[in-house]
Amino acid sequence: MEYLAKNKNTYFLGQATVFPGTAMFNTLKDINNSKKIELPVAEEMQMGMTLGFMLDGKTPISIYPRFNFLLSSINQLVNHLDKFKEMTGGKNSKAIIRTSIGSIIPLHPQCQHVGDFSKEIKSLCKNINVVKLDNPKKIFNEYKKALNRKDNISTILIEYGDFYNSK
């Protein structure tokens, strides 16, 4: 995340960006708080803010700690983020959506926190790059690629929560 934070146009928004609460917080703790926006549990609002950052020419990294939570923003994701270039006449801006398939180790959080909706999101969003980070060695390169895309296609990067405990 430090690599992404070095870019003057990036901002991190979501739950547990400024205050601890998820495993993802530890990946953001060394990033200056001026680059982070802590949000309440309001996923659709968060996606709307993500779009607002894009309209302002910024590259938001919008963090949804669990894939299941991202579902609450599906309207904005499918109807606005996926159609962003068409709706804005080709505005050159992109977002990075960071989410995770919830960990089951050391404690299983139950079915509402461990969903993998990769295939479904790919079928709904034809203009968003959807990447499952199933190998820890791919993680940095995929984030770097998402940030540096010249075509300004937004990317959803799907992490595995258990990697925080085992890799």
Predicted regions and their residues:
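Thiamine diphosphate
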Residues: 1-166
